[in-house]
């Protein structure tokens, strides 16, 4: 029985060590709210990303509504016929 209790104690000690190591990394990964310079830098970075991606945004034609005329956007009559539900295939 001495071997069983030693194994149990060793297992409990390893679990406690793993818990302490996990909690220490969790605390170390927490951002510092008192550092105003890093917050300001993060806000500037996000603003730069927003302006960069706003220039590349494209409207999504034909995804949501049928109000756009397909002939305007380069679809010929055959493509329009294939989209028509009354067209016989």
From Swiss-Prot:
GO biological process: digestion; larval foraging behavior; neuropeptide signaling pathway; regulation of response to food; social behavior
GO MF: neuropeptide hormone activity
PTM annotation (Phenylalanine amide): residues: 61
One term under GO cellular component: extracellular region
Maturation propeptide residues: 65-89
Keyword Signal: yes
Record's signal peptide: 1-29
Keywords tagged on the record: Amidation, Cleavage on pair of basic residues, Digestion, Hormone, Neuropeptide, Secreted, Signal
UniProt-annotated location(s): Secreted
Disulfide linkage: none
Role this protein plays: An integral part of the sensory system that mediates food signaling, providing the neural basis for the regulation of food response; coordinates larval foraging and social behavior changes during development. May have a hormonal role in females.
Membership in a protein family: Belongs to the NPY family.
Name of the molecule in the record: Neuropeptide F
Organism: Anopheles gambiae
């Amino acid at each position: 029985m001495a071997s069983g209790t030693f194994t149990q104690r060793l297992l409990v000690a390893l679990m406690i060590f793993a818990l302490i190591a996990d909690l220490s990394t969790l605390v170390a990964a927490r951002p510092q709210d008192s550092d105003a310079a890093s917050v300001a830098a993060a806000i500037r970075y996000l603003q730069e990303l927003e302006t960069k991606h706003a220039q590349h945004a494209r409207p999504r034609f034909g995804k949501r509504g049928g109000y756009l005329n397909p002939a305007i956007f380069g679809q010929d009559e055959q493509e329009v016929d294939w989209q028509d539900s009354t067209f016989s295939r």
